[in-house]
């Protein structure tokens, strides 16, 4: 596999076989696309540098929109990463490399596809993922990973490396950021 485009072309036809990652009723639950870029003035410095205030602000935005989940975008340029050096390697990283699902603490997290636990850890550095589980998936000779961060700590005590996780299995719970 040479590129993200190749990956997308191989995985896209399979998307209808994915299980929901969180409990979701398509006809009644509202999703809110959330903009975590610098263009959104709600993410002022004092908000993004205070985890509790950030969480309260996101929860307030969801409540106001009457949304069950907030969805953060893939490849979004996020200045929020500047608050921590965790993602600064040879150059600072500001591009979001995943899709966020923001919901109530304790919300069950399910595997979209069958897989195995690749690794799990509590990444405690400021601005890091907190309780994190990475699953390995294999589909038609295609191997890829899915990362679940900001989980409830109890999630880490319920998994082990190489543990098989079934499609749709509740293997973790959302935590706080």
Language-model regions, residue ranges each:
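Glycine-rich, flexible loop segments associated with nucleotide phosphate handling
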Residues: 92-97, 131, 143-146, 165-168
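Short glycine-rich loop/turn motifs that provide flexible caps or phosphate-binding loops at active sites
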Residues: 72, 97, 114, 129, ...
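Short, well-structured beta-strand-loop connectors
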Residues: 108-119, 158-174
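Extracellular structured ligand-interaction cores
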Residues: 96-98, 104-106, 112, 130-132
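Polar/charged, compositionally biased leader and regulatory segments
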Residues: 1-100, 104
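Short hydrophobic beta/alpha edge segments that flank linear recognition/processing sites
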Residues: 101, 132-135, 166-177
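Short alpha-helix capping/helix-loop boundary micro-motifs
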Residues: 103, 152-159
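Zn2+-dependent peptidoglycan hydrolase active-site motif and core
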Residues: 111-155
């Amino acid at each position: 596999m040479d590129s993200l485009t190749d990956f997308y072309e191989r995985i896209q036809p399979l998307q209808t076989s994915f299980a929901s990652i969180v409990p979701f009723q398509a006809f009644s639950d509202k999703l809110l696309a959330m903009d975590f870029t610098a263009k959104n003035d709600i993410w002022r410095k004092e908000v993004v540098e205070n985890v509790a205030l950030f969480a309260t602000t996101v929860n307030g935005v969801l409540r106001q929109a009457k949304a069950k989940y907030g969805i953060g975008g893939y490849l979004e340029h996020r200045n929020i990463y500047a608050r921590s050096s965790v993602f600064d390697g040879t150059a600072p990283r500001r591009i979001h490399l995943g899709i966020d699902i923001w919901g109530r603490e304790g919300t069950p997290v399910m595997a979209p596809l069958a897989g195995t636990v690749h690794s799990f850890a509590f990444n405690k550095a400021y601005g890091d993922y907190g309780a994190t589980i990475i699953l390995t998936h294999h589909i038609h000779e295609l191997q890829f990973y899915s990362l679940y961060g900001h989980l409830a700590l109890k999630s880490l005590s319920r998994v082990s490396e190489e543990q098989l996780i079934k499609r749709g299995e509740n293997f973790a719970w959302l935590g706080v950021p």
